[in-house]
Amino acid sequence: MTLEDKIENLLRPTIETMGFQFWGCEYLPAGKHSTLRIYIDKDEVGVTVDDCGKVSRQVSAIMDVEDPISNAYMLEVSSPGMDRPLFHPEQYKAYEGQEVQVRTSSPVMGRKRFKGVMSQVSESDIAVEVDGELYEIPFSLIDKANVVPQF
C-alpha cells in the first residue's frame, strides 16, 4: 500500500462525512519543503475557498494525531480544477472521450508522455490516441494523468 493509499484510507471517511468527495491526494517529497496535496470535490456545485479551509483544519488535526508522514510538509487542500488529476479507474471512465495528458513511470511503445483523446477505459488500462496512433497504457504504469481543459 502506497503512502497516498494510506492517507486516502485515513482521510476519506472524514471528508465524505463533511459532505465532500475525496478526489485524491499527492505527496511530493522535497525535504523540508515537501507537500501533501488533498483534492476535494462536491457534486455539481464545486468547492469554495472556505470549503477548502474547513477541510484543511479537519485534515490537519487528523494528520497531527495519526502522523503518517514523519517529515515536515506543507498541507494543501484544493479543488481538482479544470485540469483535474485522475487517480482512480472510475474517474478515468467519467472522462472517457476527452483529451488527457498522461505521464508513465516506464515507456509504453517507446514513450513516457502522452497527450490525446482517451478513447477507452478498461479495468486494467486506458487507450489514448496520439497523432493517429493508439496507445494502451496500464494503470500500473501511470505516474500522473490530467484532463486537458477545453476552451
From Swiss-Prot:
Transmembrane segments: none annotated. InterPro entries: Ribosome_maturation_RimP (IPR003728), RimP_C (IPR028998), RimP_C_sf (IPR036847), RimP_N (IPR028989), RimP_N_sf (IPR035956). One of its GO terms (cellular component) is cytosol. Coiled coil: none annotated. It is found in: Cytoplasm. Its main location: cytoplasm. Required for maturation of 30S ribosomal subunits. This is Ribosome maturation factor RimP. It comes from Hydrogenovibrio crunogenus (strain DSM 25203 / XCL-2) (Thiomicrospira crunogena).
